[in-house]
Amino acid sequence: MTHYILLIIGTALINNFVLVKFLGLCPFMGVSKKIETAVGMGLATMFVLTVASLCAYLVDHYILIPLNATFLRTLVFILVIAVVVQFTEMAINKTSPTLYRLLGIFLPLITTNCAVLGVALLNVNLAHNLTESVVYGFGASLGFSLVLVLFAALRERLVAADIPATFRGSAIALITAGLMSLAFMGFTGLVK
């Protein structure tokens, strides 16, 4: 049990996919203008990443490896992720049409979110078993959601701040993301 807790902490805080591995930057910058949207995107990505990790493991170990078709991993994982995203999109549209409209184009873009594909491929490269794959996907999604919501809160505060004209918009957002990355570097060495 301790191994799984350390895997979640390590994936969410120490090896964060956005701030350390630079995966998932498109939704990180695009959806982080309002906290409500960031929370919705974080929850949707959390569900997709966890389920996609499970499905990718099952497809890889029960279809691709027995058929000696591991060279198709990237393509097959993209298809698996697309199916999971479509399922998530239909569920959100049915349960919360307002959130569905708020997320807009970013919900289908989870399919092309490199963090989701990165987690699936890293699970294979790190030779995780089924439980570790799901926990790794959950930890990665937890870290993604945490960073997304924190960054959205910072960006909402930046709107009211007196920022020089040359730094407004994307410039101050990137500087803030860099400072946030430095803050997360403080977690390095937390887990041995």
Curated annotation (Swiss-Prot):
Any one biological process term the GO annotation gives: electron transport chain
Subcellular location field: Cell inner membrane
Keyword check for Transport: yes
Source organism, top-level taxon: Bacteria
Listed InterPro entries: Ion_transpt_RnfA/RsxA, NqrDE/RnfAE, NqrDE/RnfAE_oxidrdctase
Record's GO cellular component terms: plasma membrane
Keywords: Cell inner membrane, Cell membrane, Electron transport, Membrane, Translocase, Transmembrane, Transmembrane helix, Transport
Membrane association type: Multi-pass membrane protein
EC category: translocase
Transmembrane residue ranges: 5-25, 39-59, 63-83, 102-122, 134-154, 171-191
EC identifiers of the protein: 7.-.-.-
Entry's family note: Belongs to the NqrDE/RnfAE family.
Functional note: Part of a membrane-bound complex that couples electron transfer with translocation of ions across the membrane.
Record text on subunit structure and interactions: The complex is composed of six subunits: RnfA, RnfB, RnfC, RnfD, RnfE and RnfG.
Protein name: Ion-translocating oxidoreductase complex subunit A
Organism: Haemophilus influenzae (strain PittEE)
